[in-house]
Amino acid sequence: MFTREAIRHCRQCGASVAYRLPDDGDTKERAICTACHTVHYENPLNVVGTVPHWGEQVLLCKRNIEPRKGKWTLPAGFMELGESTSEGAARETTEEAGAQFVMEDLLTVMSVPRVGQVHLYYRARLTSDVFDPGHETMEARLFTEAEIPWDELAFRTVKETLEHYFADRRAGQFGTHAFDIA
């Protein structure tokens, strides 16, 4: 099971916290402030991105940052506070690929408990095949399914998402696929 570094101080008042069962009947130990009694919940992080497509091709980005620097990925990253999942996916696509696109429907939702994350990918119809990648991307390039460097993909979530995208495309109907990644 994934665990982050333990919370040591209350975000509300700065006092120390103790891990214990809350008094409200919760069955999981939580970080509880010893002074103001604020309960601090530790939740998964959301990773949001897109499958940008142009005709028969999808857009992949070669990572210029760790982890997996030099590997290919879909444009994606951590969701920011104050944005919806689709807004975050659009922002990441703009930042990483410099692409022009129209957001479409949700394609995959993947729980990745071993790293404390949930990954959500939307389809995005490209409106141009000209890209201006940001500093996190070495190269942004279009690939057909046959051209994708499957052994050079950065993350299993990217591979699974691309497999669902192309299977749905062949079937002529897109759905939303929700599953766990062990």
Residue map of PLM features:
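Beta-strand-connecting loop/turn residues
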Residues: 29, 56-57, 129
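Short glycine-/acidic-enriched loop or helix-start segments at secondary-structure transitions
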Residues: 22, 70, 152
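Short connector loops at helix/strand junctions that flank enzyme active sites
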Residues: 28, 45-47, 53, 67-69, ...
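Unchanged
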Residues: 79-102, 106-164, 168, 173-174, ...
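Acidic, metal-coordinating catalytic segment for phosphate/diphosphate chemistry
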Residues: 2-50
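Conserved hydrophobic/aromatic beta-strand scaffold that supports enzyme active sites
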Residues: 9-12, 30, 51, 60, ...
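Conserved Nudix-box catalytic region and its N-terminal flanking loop in Nudix hydrolases
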Residues: 53-95
